[in-house]
């Protein structure tokens, strides 16, 4: 999680913003749709737009100097985290892994932002459901943006208000809000998260409609699902334009695939990528309308000056042109679907997944899995119904 640091005065940010306003406004607003995934940021219409964002008042993070936007730092060395060698049960395994004190992987060349799509009557506060959980990692060294989806149904250890609990990953947000969700992901996947951006899904359809929809590939069975379950009729094909409602239904399709949550998270990432493409091709007035809708439904621990600072860096360094790479965690060797009680869950081999995610984002990992490592799945039993249960 972001640490408290000594405050630094930003350098020449506002001068940079207001130079060549008209062209810069469009570039800055296009950047928003990268930052809906990255830091939910825009630089155009600075004063009025930033006032719409809900900012976490407890954040004391440092303003980043835009003059260092292109600087590549030497990588630090990290203490090795050995995978577990013993555990008495699956819950004991994930408890020991989360609380082993392993050093979280981080880099000055990587910005990690947790994007949380929230559903529910209580919206961005406790009580909302984190329906979509995506870690967006901007790596200046590789000049890529990595998107890692976490299954919301992952059965995991979490600490809520000082009490040990075992539940689905998204329950940490429901019971403890942003801090609990970030703490749970950091401890289980051994990655330091710099910031979070929570977006209320109630804004989703209006934002996409304001941008003229999103264009993406739709498989025949996906189109059939939407046509069967809604009053809308869409075609299938390599480039289908979906309006906001259709895109939302598409992103939530879950029971049309044998792998359930795996394909669901894949579709969520596709919609986000398509949203970025729509923003890049939109006019300033379209983007302005989208921002007015979006920012009322955004909560973040970025301060307004940090937003300006990172946005300035993004323009100066061409972050908007970085390739987006999906970090796919669908390897059947690293997860199992099953039940805890009557609830459908995803069991994850956390040491293996943590190593894979770290390697994808940073190019290496401080997690070591070897022949002596205890596998989490040795504590699962396969039932006659083909589903796993923890023991």
For each feature predicted by the language model, list its residue ranges.
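Non-catalytic, solvent-exposed segments at the cell envelope interface
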Residues: 2-35, 41-391
